[in-house]
Amino acid sequence: MRYGLPTLACGALFLCLTSCVSSLRFSAKKSSQDPLKQADPQASLSIGEKTRGMRACSGFLDLYLPPSGEALWLRLPPPVRDEGGRLVLARALYVEGLESGLGSNPVGLDRGQLGSPVLVEFSRLGNRVVLERPNLRYRADGADADERRAVDESFASSVLWAAVIAAEDPDGAVLVDFTSFVLRDAHGVARTLVGAGQGSFHLDAKRSFLESAGCHAFPDNVELSARLTFTGENPGRHVRSTSPDPNTVSLRAHHSLVRLPDVDYVHRGADPRAGGFAVRYANYAAGLEEPIHRSLAVRHRLVAANPGDASSAPVEPIVYYVDRGAPEPVRSALLEGAGWWAEAFTAAGFEDAFRVELLPEGAHPLDVRYNVIQWVHRSTRGWSYGNALSDPRTGEIIKGHVSLGSLRVRQDRLLFEGLLGTAATGTGAADDPIQLSLARIRQLAAHEVGHTLGLAHNFSASTYAGRASVMDYPAPLLSVTPDGEIDSSNAYAVGMGAWDLVAIRWLYGRAPEGIAEDEWLSSVLADAADRDLRYLSDSDARSPGAAHPLANLWDNFSNPVTGLENALAVRRVALERFGLDNLGAGQPRAHLEEVLTPVYFHHRYQVGATIKVVGGVDYSHSLIGDGRSVGGPVEGEEQRRALAILLDCLSPERLDIPESVNHLIPPRPPGQSRGEELAGTTTGPAFDALELARIQCAQVVDGLLHPERCARLVDQSRRFSDLPSLEEVIATLSERVYQPDPAATPRHGELQGIALGAVVRGIMALADDARATHGVRARARSGLRGLLALPSHVGDPSPAWRAHRDYWAVEVEAFFARPAQALPSVPDAPTLPPGGPIGGRSLGLGAYGECSGHW
């Protein structure tokens, strides 16, 4: 099998067994009701007779709607035999999604959210039509019918729906009531609500109905719409905040049935070095000398009109459409940013192959004929997505669908107003927070469209070639001028980067005449490697224990330590100047806390990047025979440099907030809750500056003492004597916080005590962490004992620090005195307020979701 469906010969066996059982059961009656024949008396009607008076919609599959609009009838064409001789009425790609959303990012039921395309086939089983999803994870490419049948019968398929045949024509075409298929909870809304802790919901059939005006049949696709109502009890806070009646949630669902693409599409094998997505499956027809697992690159069909020319127009260009619901000036920013990809296609040898336009009036954003950039509103800022809806057989992209959260641009404006103030807001100047936010939206549009073109994240791209890809998460590149001003003139790059050009060339480009495609594709990646263009993606970057120092989200600079030094300098200036001018006129002064919080944590992502240097590993993805270096541990000197600046982040000077800022923030006005954007508080309604310090200390300490990082420190130091050991890292942390400055004021003494507590708690947690190896836990326990043995002070410590020391000394003694079977009693660390969109918590080392983030 190459592009056709696997044969399900087991269906023939099922029919045979069914017939035999029926014969035994009803032989005494000699019934004429053979289960392989029509059992419904109405089935003797022709389709024309059954649908008389209904509105007909002719297309890929014909639809019939009665005047009441309460039902949907589907005509299926006469059956044809597939490659295995099985009769199939129709095959299609099926995609379901939501036309309207709940509006809550943590729950995730967004407007325009689509499921993954699946292959389905309609077949006849007695007096029923069955809609079945074949199993494409296991195939037998190019094999004969017997080999394909062996694979098909070895793995399960999934029957999605079935219905009794209502009418039939002499040629074998049949009519079925398709209403129940459209009115089912295909998107799993009830399951999602329950899984998100939002109560026990179920689909209410009495309050769910077809949207007949949204049901259309086109030559190559059928689009169906329904309004579904879910009822439940004990609704969670996200449902209460977004649904007018929290016990009743009504959403519009969408279904698409799409004609299968023709077999002219030429697939391209995926390469783990190329930075793209892939369709993966097991090919049981592979030769014994070949790997059984196969990967196909996910990409649009793009064919040169003049393949012999080095540069050619395409037979059909790739066109994206921007949602008319996006307002100006955002709409123009989306058109411009998404349009940057035209440059990459031109460089790959295609003229006018990519363009971006406004969605035609009346066009449905979920219609699979349109690649769409959709503007989505939520009650809080949230994720943006780029979905490449592809043929699961070949990887050919059928529809690109981008969902952009509308509150992102407002959050970016708030971030820049925190750093730069509000004086320039709305002026159109270079440092206008609105203009900077629009620059970010251009980047975001390009980034998400990149996903729908088949490209994955490249989280190392911000470290080379002047920010080499829009597929990284771009932190604004800010700096401090010699006269102490924050310079935002180079905040975001414009246009395609060096890696973007490579990735599109590899994915869509054509080998020159006379050169084999595989050879040419390898040369494209070899040239990129020679230019030190790295590709590191989510698996390299997102985990808190990740190892590569250059695989980071929201970072800048080729060296993480240099990047942290720069971020700390920008943060210092922003905090020193923070005041009433950082919030717009007429806003409640308490809202200064929303502006201050991201300024205080401005360096959080560079902290996360610098943590990866300690116990870090510098590597590249490679294939056998490509000549790339495997890499090795980060040099010891660089690891110790990183450790030193991370310890500096625990100093009172870094943790404190100027008193000029502390007194600015009053309690919140009546009726305004703190929300999820802010840190927790231990001081009731009053601003809690010390909680921010506790959070910052926890990020540094817990990141350094992650079990995977500690395991690497153990292994690296035993192999290379010049690299820091886990014992050295624990001892350095302990000495820094257990021997404070004797001249510290009470103000700083409390902050020193907070840092001490973070270190002791972090080592205790590591010693008790079941994920850590015995060797790591043993060193953590030894480090705790060593910490208690350190000299308590030089000179006379502040009373505040002494109180913390005495408290933690008792805690450590109690820790060691616990019975062996007792549960751990390590207190939890405070968590950072969201940097990525609401819905996930992170220590700044990663984010959750497809595309998210602070900036």
Task: Locate the predicted segments by residue.
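Bacterial N-terminal signal peptides
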Residues: 9-19
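Auxiliary tRNA-acceptor-end handling modules of aminoacyl-tRNA synthetases
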Residues: 25-326, 344, 358-411, 416-433, ...
